[in-house]
Amino acid sequence: MAFKKKLYQFRPKDQPQKIERHVTKDRKRTVSVNSISLERDVRQMLAEKISGTHVGLWLLIGEHLRLRTWDLLTSWTGSGHNNTIEPRLALQMVHESALCVTGVRERRTLRQKGFETLNGLPFVATDVAIHQLLDHHTIAEAEALQVALGQIRSARGHYQGQYVLIDPHRIMTWSKRQMPPKKASSSSPIRKNMQTFFAIDGESGQPLSFGIGSSSVRVSQATLSLIDRLAYILPHKALILADSEHFTVEIFNRLLNNRQFTILMPTPRRKKILQQAQSLTFTPKWAGYAVAEDSYQLTGQENSYRLIVQRTGETKDNYNYKSFATTSNKDKADLMTLIFPQRWDIEEFFKDESALGWNRASTFNLNIRYGRLSMALIAQAVIYQLRKKLSENINRWTAESMAQKFFKGIDGDLRVKNDKIIVTLYNAPSVEILKEHYENLPRKLEAEGVDPRVPWLYDFKVDFRFK
């Protein structure tokens, strides 16, 4: 029978992987895992029951199933079946973003509170394991993930507006790489920044996609790449509201005859444009406000663009001119007074949601940053769906408040009953509203046409009790 020895080594698709995990707050250990050991250890943890303060995160499971998060993550990781570890590590990143955790993982205490089990893991992976996963996936794969997520969100009605807000958002970075320091604003100190470009739906305030600038990627390149992804995500026409730094030949030439997108942006305060604005004949709209229109041609270009100008002030001595360039044919006064001011709503998005992962960057490795920020997009999407089911005084909380008071601030326990994981939450806020949406969750999901089995929890269903 010697010929039968070590046949397990030839078992297909189940080779063990080395993963670094947290053992305690200060100790780490590299362990060998495969799909069988993962399932065995997770089932053992559930059989022993779990108590902790992270059970509020389990309310996101229903939203994950509705948003098809698992399909997105398995596609991004290239996993062929549901028992692999890579999409579970990606799910850990999504839930870390939801908790707004920052700093080095050695300083965190996420273990044994229901967090790792939620990810379908018997442990919390370390920075090394997470960075190895992210570094193996390219920028193109992260962009494809953004498009797939955006298409799902569009189908679910998350994007309703006629306007898309595009804004450069600078993230502080503590990377040791040599890079030119910049100012995030005229009043801020000079420091290393990572420049990102976000596209936000103008009506719902929800993010569509993002790009990252680097030394080799100019503003025009990053913006046009972002607009290309928007064309796959949005099924309808939209007006893009941009900043003056997007005033480039490449962007205008691309959008001049675009059938889906038009653009509106303030022009830079150049002497040539100011002289042209001052020479126009203005039409008064109300006291101290007048508008005018002309065409403008960039130097060396054959194409001309619509130049609209607003003039404020009552007398010639205190006139102030502000000009905009656009490819839209909407009324000029409406564009400048009603539509463009909506662009500043994007600042509200960064103020409320940046703690999910858009406020600091520890590395400038682009594979890692694109992957990490894309996981934060998924976290923001499922939290948005959860917010719509909460009371008004809670759904207006910032991402950080949601993490502290809701996801980490509710005591509870987990136990298994037949094919269900029963999650009990004690002293949850707005309990009657939560009962309405989450008690008997499997039945509610089936009524919506959603499979209630959770693939990363080995097809267990999840139900909730509130006490």
Positions of PLM-derived features:
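Dynamic "connector" segments at or just before major functional cores
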Residues: A2-S188, F198-S216, T223-D228, Y232, ...
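Domain-level cores of phosphate- or acyl-group-handling catalytic modules
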Residues: V217-K272
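Short acidic (Asp/Glu) and glycine-rich catalytic loops that position anionic groups and cofactors
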Residues: L38, L72, R111-K113, G205, ...
